Amino acid sequence: MFQLVVDDEIVLVLAEERHAQLMTELIKRNQSRLARWEPWAEQPATISSTRAYIRAALEDFLRGCQISTIIALDGGGRFIGRCGLRINPHAGSGDIGYWIDAEYEGRGITRRAAHALVTAAFSELDLKRVDLRTSVENKRSRGLAERLGFSFKGTHARGLRFANRTDDLALYTVTAQEWTAKQP
């Protein structure tokens, strides 16, 4: 299946059902932190819910609508987060999302993983645009979007719906042409 070697430390591995146990443990370790930014993380992680997510993501992968990867170290042996791309093949665009275990935050791993996936979106999938959507309050994610070269396009009032609240959504975008021009 799909695997993307980012560098000598990081590999993005397509999430498969055999990864459900490890993914569930990783989500549980980070649940309270993730639930602040991700509506899906408000529900307790279970192996069955993780398996269901992986099955749906694999079906979407086969249809060309999603690439859901695990950020892994040690040649794929240690799972530390997730980086994915939802694809709209008709529009030629994608939506990137990511999260990482708190223990690995601040080391540039998420930036490198996201950079590799956006590069693949343009060079391998021939997408024309990649969007990044996050809470306006999520300063780390917004900072990452800007470091990657995405442009802030505006906010969607109450665009992120949680069980007991809504957050305004910040939208960032980069086109294939902009991405190529910004690469060394």
Regions found by a protein language model. Give the residues of each.
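Acyl-donor (CoA/ACP) binding surface of acyl/acetyltransferases
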Residues: 1-22, 26-33, 68-184
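Conserved GNAT-fold acetyl-CoA-binding loop/helix
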Residues: 35-55
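Short, polar/charged, Gly/Pro-enriched helix-capping and turn/loop motifs at alpha-helix termini
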Residues: 37, 41, 64-68, 128
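A short hydrophobic/aromatic micro-motif that marks alpha-helical segments and, especially, helix-coil
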Residues: 45-46, 61, 164, 179
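Generic recognition of well-ordered alpha-helical segments
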Residues: 52-56, 116-119
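Short, P/G- and charge-enriched loop/turn segments at secondary-structure junctions
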Residues: 56-58, 159
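Short loop/turn motifs at secondary-structure junctions and domain boundaries
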Residues: 59-64, 150
